[in-house]
């Protein structure tokens, strides 16, 4: 079946969209299948990028999970959440990315009714796990830095694991409507031909795509981002205030603790920044298409924006391990050891201060006109060996 021109479609291209990665088939942007440069780029370069994303993402996330599972000193609150992020990314890389890549080789939806129900729900579940876990990580950083005395000290790892499971349950439940309403449909063209597509909402009117895109944007992007921003506003305010209240005689000790706090918060903030950077273009594009449901944009610029948004959104599933590699000395050492199949074990009490909110010495500073009282508390639900482990 030759590629179709957008001008021949009698049904809006949004009918092909999945919930977060727009499903406008790139062949619809192309002229006839005559080996043009545009066609070669789309059918060869883009799938190659997908292959790189899958390969790099699998390597990084599998290594990350393996390191956390095989090193007892790495099992703490933030690392449980980070492993949760990696699990969600692996789910997306193993299912949704290959399915999306297949659209560059097939003219129609080839995964049947069951695939049409499962794939959109799986993708939405993965995105939910990512954004809700980032919110939970930010909340953990808030408690560790702003209210360190309120941190739970017993059963913290079990409680955190239950939270991680809860995130998956909520994400799956929120994705159920996607599985219910997604269906395989025949999309007609003005040239009297038709093709099969998986559509995420009923074809009845223009209201469904608008409601769908707005809810997706609010639940999976804007609301979590607002919550995270509030947490980090208070974190920044606390860090700035603590920096001004540091007593001179405790300078070296408190300076090291302050650097620990900043680094812990920085790692989570980098994860959030990567998520926003990778997913924001896709959300904007989906909103634009949903509110211009009957208008088709066949321009080259729109095609490029679509491709970039899609590649960026999937790239988010492979960036977290590399961000952690750059920011965490402990993780970097373990990663290099695993990659080289080495047997060298690194001391658990590293000189680097990294990701252990459940095991970091937090200092509560209270000043008055004559003195400063410094209370150091070891917030650890497991053992002192986790004090500065990743």
Curated annotation (Swiss-Prot):
Membrane topology: Multi-pass membrane protein
Expressed in which tissues: Expressed in a subset of neurons of the pre-Botzinger complex. Within the pre-Botzinger complex, there is some overlap with neurons expressing Grpr with some cells expressing only Grpr or Nmbr while some cells express both. Expressed in dorsal root ganglion neurons and mast cells. Expressed in lung.
Residues with lipidation of kind S-palmitoyl cysteine: 341
Cytoplasmic side: 66-79, 140-156, 236-266, 328-390
Consequence of gene disruption: Reduction in rate of basal sighing without affecting the respiratory rate. Significantly reduced sneezing responses to chemical and allergen stimuli.
Spans traversing the lipid bilayer: 42-65, 80-99, 118-139, 157-177, 212-235, 267-287, 300-327
Subcellular location: Cell membrane
Gene Ontology molecular function, alphabetical: bombesin receptor activity
GO process annotations (BP): antiviral innate immune response; negative regulation of interleukin-6 production; positive regulation of interferon-alpha production; positive regulation of osteoclast proliferation; positive regulation of respiratory gaseous exchange; sneeze reflex
Segments in the Extracellular topological domain: 1-41, 100-117, 178-211, 288-299
GO cellular-component term (any): plasma membrane
Keyword vocabulary terms for this entry: Cell membrane, Disulfide bond, G-protein coupled receptor, Glycoprotein, Lipoprotein, Membrane, Palmitate, Phosphoprotein, Receptor, Transducer, Transmembrane, Transmembrane helix
Modified residues (Phosphoserine): 352
Gene induction: Up-regulated in lung tissue in response to infection with influenza A virus.
Keyword Glycosyltransferase among UniProt keywords: no
Its biological purpose: Receptor for neuromedin-B. Contributes to the maintenance of basal sigh rate through signaling in the pre-Botzinger complex, a cluster of several thousand neurons in the ventrolateral medulla responsible for inspiration during respiratory activity. Contributes to the induction of sneezing following exposure to chemical irritants or allergens which causes release of NMB by nasal sensory neurons and activation of NMBR-expressing neurons in the sneeze-evoking region of the brainstem. These in turn activate neurons of the caudal ventral respiratory group, giving rise to the sneezing response.
Protein name: Neuromedin-B receptor
Native species: Mus musculus
Gene name in the database record: Nmbr
């Amino acid at each position: 079946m030759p590629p179709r021109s957008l001008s021949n479609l009698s049904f809006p291209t949004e009918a092909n969209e999945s919930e977060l990665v727009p499903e406008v088939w790139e062949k619809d942007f192309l002229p006839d299948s005559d080996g043009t440069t545009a066609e070669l780029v789309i059918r060869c370069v883009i799938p190659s990028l997908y292959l790189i994303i899958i390969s790099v993402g699998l390597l990084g996330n599998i290594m990350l999970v393996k390191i956390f599972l095989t090193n007892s000193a790495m099992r703490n609150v933030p690392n449980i959440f980070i492993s949760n992020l990696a699990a969600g990314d692996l789910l997306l890389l193993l299912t949704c990315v290959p399915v999306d890549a297949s659209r560059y080789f097939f003219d129609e939806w080839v995964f049947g009714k069951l695939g049409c129900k499962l794939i959109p729900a799986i993708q939405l579940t993965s995105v939910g796990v990512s954004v809700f876990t980032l919110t939970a990580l930010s909340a953990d950083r808030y408690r560790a830095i702003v209210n360190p005395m309120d941190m739970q000290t017993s059963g913290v790892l079990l409680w955190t694991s239950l939270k991680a499971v809860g995130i998956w349950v909520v994400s799956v439940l929120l994705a159920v409507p996607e599985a219910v309403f997604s269906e395989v449909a025949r999309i007609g063209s003005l040239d009297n031909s038709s093709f099969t597509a998986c559509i995420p909402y009923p074809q009845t009117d223009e209201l469904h795509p608008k409601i769908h895109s707005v809810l997706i944007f609010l639940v999976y992007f804007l609301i979590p981002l607002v919550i995270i921003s509030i947490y980090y506003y208070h974190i920044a305010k606390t860090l700035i205030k603590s920096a001004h209240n540091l007593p001179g005689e405790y300078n070296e000790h408190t300076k090291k603790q302050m650097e620990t706090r900043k680094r812990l918060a920085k790692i989570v903030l980098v994860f959030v920044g990567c998520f926003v950077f990778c997913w924001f273009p896709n959300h904007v594009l989906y909103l634009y298409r949903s509110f211009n449901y009957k208008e088709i944009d066949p321009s080259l610029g729109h095609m490029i924006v679509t491709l970039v948004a899609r590649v960026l959104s999937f790239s988010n599933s492979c960036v977290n391990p590399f961000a952690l590699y750059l920011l965490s000395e402990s993780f970097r050492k373990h990663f290099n050891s695993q990659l080289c199949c080495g047997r060298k074990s690194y001391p658990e009490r590293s000189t680097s201060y990294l990701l252990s909110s459940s095991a970091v010495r937090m200092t509560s500073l209270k000043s008055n006109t004559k003195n400063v009282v410094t209370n150091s508390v070891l917030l650890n639900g497991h053992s002192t060996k986790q004090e500065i482990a990743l």
